[in-house]
Amino acid sequence: MLLGVSALAESDTLVIYFSCTGTTKGVAERLASVTGADLYEIVPAVPYTAEDLNYNDRSTRATSEQDHPETRPEIGGEDVDLTGYSTIYIGYPIWWGEEPRILCTFVESHDFTDKTVIPFCTSGGSGIGRSGDDLAKLAGTGNWLKGARHSGSISENELSAWVEGLK
């Protein structure tokens, strides 16, 4: 179930994701399916265009945001209430070896107290690096587990095995 601020939780597990190209979205949807989790998309107030994501152009929006760690892009759409969730997966692409700055906006504006948080990322070649640790530090609350990088083509069976390995 895709959640907004007024939705009632149907599960004690939530998959939160940010995706510009659909790769992370696909993994998040499969993860929600195998865990029975609710699903929430972090939507930027100003959507990213293909030009914004051109990694070969140092003047693009995404490059500028990543070059300035203090940048906090605004989140649009409805917010999500984390009350009632005990396990939260947070998925995102890796941009220039790090989490996109909009993830910083999200974790700094939510309370993860008494939550187990599992970061996951998608990337064409980079690993998860320190992004999960960076987000945990910014959040300041929650029990953040070691995250993992998944390919966009990861199967539900592979995701199930990963989830089981977290226990």
Give residue ranges: language-model regions.
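A short helix->loop->beta-strand "cap" motif at the edges of active sites that frequently abuts
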Residues: 113-116, 141
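Short, surface-exposed alpha-helical segments at coil->helix boundaries
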Residues: 25, 29, 100, 128-133, ...
